[in-house]
Amino acid sequence: MNRDNAIAWSVEDLCVNYDHSDVLCHITFSLPAGAMAAIIGPNGAGKSTLLKASLGLIRASSGQSLFFGQRFSKVHHRIAYMPQRASVDWDFPMTVLDLVLMGCYGYKGIWNRISTDDRQEAMRILERVGLEAFANRQIGKLSGGQQQRAFLARSLMQKADLYLMDELFSAIDMASYQMVVDVLQELKSEGKTIVVIHHDLSNVRKLFDHVILLNKHLVCSGSVEECLTKEAIFQAYGCELELLDYTLKLSRGKYQGSC
């Protein structure tokens, strides 16, 4: 398959069921390589479940997900996954530098020695996200925004082709926000594929070129223009886009934190 024209992520008839209750129902879509995509939908829509089921972190009841035409186990080294902050044990005795160096494991292996070159590369990436001064700090001692940037740095260390990021913009202030946006734009300019679970519909048009709109089933997958219509938003959220944008602007503070 030509990597320049590949489908980076395809999902076919994916279903996930918890305790006899449908969480995701018959999800089918494909995402072209090089896209900058937002996964959006109301709370409980199955956004995080979609990522986890596609990566095999939770079991799907049916269907399949392929990355660059292959199962995840065959191409795991090409994929970087950034989990939600809430799922991380921030008390774990690990420094920021240690966390970033974990990004090497996909292409070096767990048991191979970390080299001086690896450490220098990790420090360059920490400088890129503004955390070089915190390299030796325990990860739980960072602010919310710094923690997000540390995990972003780990993802960058993986040198992946596809980045799957769960609530990347959660708990960051505006300075961190702009830094993260700049990094994403750099990745896109390098031909990388980026997928972000996102909550703020007011800036989807500015940040992304592709949308995956969910509410347990697939409402729309396509360009921002195709998916951010009144009809699609009403189908997913139960209200019109203008009202939803206004509501999200009022509540946006809960998604912002310290740097």
Swiss-Prot record:
UniProt-listed PROSITE patterns: ABC_TRANSPORTER_1 (PS00211), ABC_TRANSPORTER_2 (PS50893)
What the entry lists under InterPro entries is as follows: AAA+_ATPase, ABC_transporter-like_ATP-bd, ABC_transporter-like_CS, Metal_Ion_Import_ABC, P-loop_NTPase
The record, for Gene3D superfamilies, names: P-loop containing nucleotide triphosphate hydrolases (3.40.50.300)
Give binding positions for ATP.
41-48
Q: Indicate whether Phosphoprotein appears among the record's keywords.
A: no
Q: What does this protein do?
A: Part of an ATP-driven transport system CT_067/CT_068/CT_069/CT_070 for a metal. Probably responsible for energy coupling to the transport system.
Q: Which family does it belong to?
A: Belongs to the ABC transporter superfamily.
Q: Where in the cell is it found?
A: Cell inner membrane
Cellular component terms, GO, for this chain's entry? ATP-binding cassette (ABC) transporter complex
The protein here is known as Probable metal transport system ATP-binding protein CT_068
Give every ABC transporter domain span.
9-241
**GO MF annotation terms:** ATP binding; ATP hydrolysis activity; ATPase-coupled transmembrane transporter activity
Membrane-protein topology? Peripheral membrane protein
> Which Pfam families does the entry mention?
ABC_tran (PF00005)
Assigned keywords, A-Z: ATP-binding, Cell inner membrane, Cell membrane, Membrane, Nucleotide-binding, Transport
